[in-house]
């Protein structure tokens, strides 16, 4: 297993690259954007072991209103490709949690999900109307939210993508959600109310706890790493708080 510092993804999947470019573009519009350093053994990993080829690249940043902007690109055994992104807000600001995941097995997109998840009570009332008007009629295979998914908003979008038009439509939805997020972040002001700050901390902790209930994440990683490494990766890289 080899850890490297990588500056751009080695994946050439067109859909992942389109989404990645879009997310990075919106991220660049945030104020005071700075990179975050993390243990190299957890950030960028490459293995060329036959049958267990592995590539994981992580990007970590912070910005005004956001404590952590995380993007993960991964490929397992040259079959399974993943794009994972979570923008965690700074609890001192009234900003939702942006989350997006794309899972592709060979050429089939089995899961595509995006949401602006509330980070405090009734926060979603501020932006629900900005998301609810999106036309999703093109999608034929919307998926059911898992039991632990009560952390998501009522406008969470989750589907399998069957064709190029659905892939294109999903990219547009992600772009729209990011536009709303950036708009909310630019209008948000620093809060000093300790009660609401604590509420936002508690919401983020619950978001991370619920995400950790998704056993598919650990099951994939356990095929390539031992349990100790997987637990550390999930708790320190994916869903830390």
Swiss-Prot record:
| This protein's record includes keyword Oxidoreductase | yes
Any idea which UniProt keywords this protein has?
Answer: Oxidoreductase
* A biological-process GO annotation: phytochromobilin biosynthetic process
GO MF, one term, reads:
cobalt ion binding
An example of a Pfam family matching this protein is Fe_bilin_red
Instruction: Tell me which EC number(s) this protein carries.
Output: 1.3.7.5
Reactions that this protein is recorded to catalyse: (2R,3Z)-phycocyanobilin + 4 oxidized [2Fe-2S]-[ferredoxin] = biliverdin IXalpha + 4 reduced [2Fe-2S]-[ferredoxin] + 4 H(+)
What domain of life? Answer: Bacteria
Q: Which InterPro entries match?
A: Ferredoxin-dep_bilin_Rdtase, Ferredoxin_bilin_OxRdtase
Q: Which residues form a coiled coil?
A: none
The record's section on PANTHER family has:
PHYTOCHROMOBILIN:FERREDOXIN OXIDOREDUCTASE, CHLOROPLASTIC (PTHR34557:SF1)
**Its family?**
Belongs to the HY2 family.
Q: What does this protein do?
A: Catalyzes the four-electron reduction of biliverdin IX-alpha (2-electron reduction at both the A and D rings); the reaction proceeds via an isolatable 2-electron intermediate, 181,182-dihydrobiliverdin.
Name of the protein: Phycocyanobilin:ferredoxin oxidoreductase
Q: Which gene encodes it?
A: pcyA
